[in-house]
């Protein structure tokens, strides 16, 4: 039975490359999400330009709020696809480490 040595795994260059790749995706995505999400309440609290009508009686604030739903769906779909790629990479890494152990 394979017993993982997590310190050894964390020290491997391939695992470090994986973490770098994962961080390169997650950190910018999270920053974008939080900025986009919190900009609506901040902008509507301190500015009035979002109150202007955009399409008929629908204001820019409503369009921004609807865009947040779309952004959430798109970001979660992109993350799900990227996570599948990460899972494949980790599975291959585990197989490589098992091969080195035996």
UniProtKB/Swiss-Prot annotation:
Transmembrane segments: 24-44, 55-75
Chief site of localization: membrane
Places the protein is found: Cell membrane
GO CC annotation, single: plasma membrane
Domain of life of the source: Bacteria
Keywords attached to this entry: Cell membrane, Membrane, Transmembrane, Transmembrane helix
Topology of the protein relative to the lipid bilayer: Multi-pass membrane protein
PANTHER family (alphabetical): INTEGRAL MEMBRANE PROTEIN-RELATED, MEMBRANE PROTEIN
Identification of the protein by name: Uncharacterized protein YwcB
Organism: Bacillus subtilis (strain 168)
Gene this protein is translated from: ywcB
